[in-house]
């Protein structure tokens, strides 16, 4: 267990097949609507699931709103301080007993139907396919977001292509589903707390022989992201050190 966090879970009688982790930071304005949207989509698709909202530090009423959400399949994990998306997702992955586990950004800028697409592909694939991951550059993706984000994203993708031996076009889109057995192999070794977490996770899964399927996504960008030139530079620096770490280990 991670020191410095508490969890509130509600009982459910049917063992789910999919655990969805939603890292959340100050999402009180949208979390209730997003959870209703997520639950309806998964129910309509006939997917048995549990959803874990990991609130990445105090600051608003996100946690209390999740606790009050009227569905026993939704739980909340509260972190005592803001530690980063990677730490939040790792915390949500802990003690998972479902066959599949994934994560999606809590604001649902990415349409949650991608989770159903990813799950179907994993079910129909062999065990060597460890994950199905969203890709904004997939030819069937529907993506509209600001030029500044496009520039940062394009530069970052080129940087990743140079520094890492991954045959993937997009490592950072916040919608991914994995086989839990794959996650179990690498979870104890994961170190990254920030946005570079996705890249570390994929690299370590690839080292363990797992393959990936890239899937299209629909992105409805709501213009509230904190990603800018400064955070882009910070991400590049963190990714540079991750490349060095992975080469040495």
What are these regions (language model features)?
Residues 1-16, 163-165, 189-249:
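Hydrophobic helical membrane-anchoring modules
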Residues 2-40, 47:
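N-proximal low-complexity "stem/linker" segments adjacent to membrane-targeting elements
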Residues 49-52, 63-95:
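Conserved donor nucleotide-binding strand/loop of the catalytic core
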Residues 55-63, 108:
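A conserved acidic beta->alpha catalytic loop
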Residues 27-30, 58, 85, 111:
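Donor nucleotide-sugar binding loop of glycosyltransferases
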């Amino acid at each position: 267990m991670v020191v410095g966090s508490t969890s509130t879970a509600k009982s459910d009688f049917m063992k789910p097949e999919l655990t969805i982790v939603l890292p959340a930071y100050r999402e009180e304005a949208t979390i209730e609507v997003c959870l209703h949207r997520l639950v309806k989509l998964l129910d309509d698709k006939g997917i048995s699931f549990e959803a874990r909202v990991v609130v990445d530090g105090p600051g608003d009423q996100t946690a209390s709103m999740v606790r009050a959400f009227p569905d026993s399949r939704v739980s909340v994990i509260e972190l005592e301080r803001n530690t980063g998306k990677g730490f939040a997702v790792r915390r949500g992955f802990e003690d998972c007993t479902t066959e599949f586990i994934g994560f999606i950004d809590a604001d649902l800028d990415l349409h949650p139907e991608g989770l159903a697409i990813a799950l179907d592909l994993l079910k129909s694939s062999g065990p060597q396919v460890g994950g199905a991951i969203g890709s904004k550059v997939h030819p069937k993706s529907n993506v509209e977001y600001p030029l500044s984000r496009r520039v940062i994203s394009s530069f970052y993708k080129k940087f990743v292509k140079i520094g890492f031996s991954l045959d993937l076009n997009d490592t950072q889109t916040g919608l991914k589903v994995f086989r839990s057995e794959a996650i179990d192999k690498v979870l104890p070794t994961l170190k990254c707390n920030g946005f570079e977490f996705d890249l570390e996770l994929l690299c370590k899964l690839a080292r363990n022989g797992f393959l990936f399927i890239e899937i299209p996504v629909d992105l409805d960008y709501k213009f509230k992201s904190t990603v800018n030139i400064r955070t882009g530079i910070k991400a590049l620096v963190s990714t540079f050190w991750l490349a060095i770490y992975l080469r040495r280990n």
